[in-house]
Amino acid sequence: MLLCIAAAGLGLTTLSVRHQQVKTEEDKITVVTSFYPMYVAAMNVIGDSDQIELENLSEPQTGCLHDYQLTPEDMKLLSTADVFIVNGGGIESFLSDVAEAYPDLTIIQATDGIDLVDDN
């Protein structure tokens, strides 16, 4: 998982360089994470960059995201996001709705490239 987060960090660096060409220096890249563990991992990768604003979608005490329902506030936050970092692997059942609503949003799934164990 740490390798995925590091890869996501490299992706954010690339996005930062690309967005710097398009945006003014006062604008920041907005990164949203799906839940608190992803937020902490992203925070550790991003560090103290003044070019990236990091937000978390769900409350820190939110448990399992399998049954999480997006709120209007969540959709508003995602509408301003450049990047959405999620766990993937089916944890975020709302992910297809987000991808459909915001086709230009870059979605990074931390489980990409990992062979997941089938629990059945």
Predicted regions and their residues:
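Extracytoplasmic metal-acquisition and chelation regions
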Residues: 1-120
